[in-house]
């Protein structure tokens, strides 16, 4: 009888945990990976909100009920930590910029800068400050300036900030916004995360992915924090993301490891 009572008690506790919800605010580039992480996390149901990290940070700072924040940079979660809204920030994943090119663009690692500077070519980026991907693109422009003076002004002036803003277009279900914008020829080349470029090419195998040359390369460190006052399951979700299982899921989606666990 005691064994049966213990089993029933355990089942009740498991059901209670399953009914708990944890609100995760995360960078849009993490959607596929963290949806899979959430499905593997058994201690609570994860209610995920995805978007540009800078815009999510603003919403959290204004009091929205996020419990875990996974950002595409370290600065946004650190600003919440500094303001007393969140706990310590942990580096949990890394990404980098790639160039995603329309099928008819003759672009490679050697001529990438020349092609981006071509006045006839449309260069797409995300929105700086609102979305770290845009900040990383501007960092690439600064590196281009050191290689070829005048490049920063030319690139920053011509760059089309097509995603990552409050009014940016959204892709329909089953499509990526980058694949959609290239198909509509809103851009000829798009500077985006390598993970996002891989997802877009799954949608259209004719799209080209160009590695950014070393002199222009920009890496992205992703930061994770738990918001003050969150449920205990929120910290356990963060630990699960940092665990071997969570890191393996992120790696499957093209991310490289953050802090070792």
Regions found by a protein language model. Give the residues of each.
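Bacterial N-terminal signal peptides
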Residues: 2-15
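Exported/periplasmic ABC-transporter solute-binding proteins
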Residues: 19-64, 71-74, 78-84, 92-95, ...
């Amino acid at each position: 009888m005691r064994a049966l009572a213990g089993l029933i008690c355990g089942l009740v506790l498991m059901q209670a945990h399953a009914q708990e919800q944890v609100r995760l605010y995360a960078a849009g580039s993490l959607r596929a990976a963290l949806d899979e992480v959430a499905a593997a996390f058994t201690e609570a149901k994860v209610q995920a909100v995805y978007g540009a990290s800078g815009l999510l940070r603003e919403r959290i700072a204004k009091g929205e009920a996020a419990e875990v924040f996974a950002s595409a940079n370290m600065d946004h979660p650190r600003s919440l930590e500094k303001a007393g809204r969140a706990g310590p920030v942990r580096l949990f994943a890394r990404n980098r910029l790639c160039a995603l090119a329309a099928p008819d663009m003759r672009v490679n690692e050697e001529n990438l800068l020349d092609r981006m500077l071509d006045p006839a070519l449309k260069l797409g980026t995300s929105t700086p400050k609102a979305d770290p991907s845009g900040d990383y693109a501007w960092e690439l422009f600064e590196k281009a300036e050191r290689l070829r003076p005048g490049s920063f002004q030319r690139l920053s002036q011509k760059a089309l900030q097509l995603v990552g803003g409050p009014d940016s277009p959204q892709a329909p279900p089953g499509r990526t916004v980058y694949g959609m914008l290239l198909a509509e020829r809103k851009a000829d080349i798009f500077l985006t995360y390598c993970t996002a470029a891989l997802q877009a090419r799954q949608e259209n195998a004719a799209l080209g992915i160009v590695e950014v040359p070393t002199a222009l390369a920009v890496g992205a460190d992703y930061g994770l924090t738990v918001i003050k006052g969150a449920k205990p399951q929120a910290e356990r979700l963060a630990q699960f993301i940092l665990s071997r299982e969570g890191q393996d899921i992120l790696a499957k989606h093209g991310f490289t490891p953050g802090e070792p666990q």
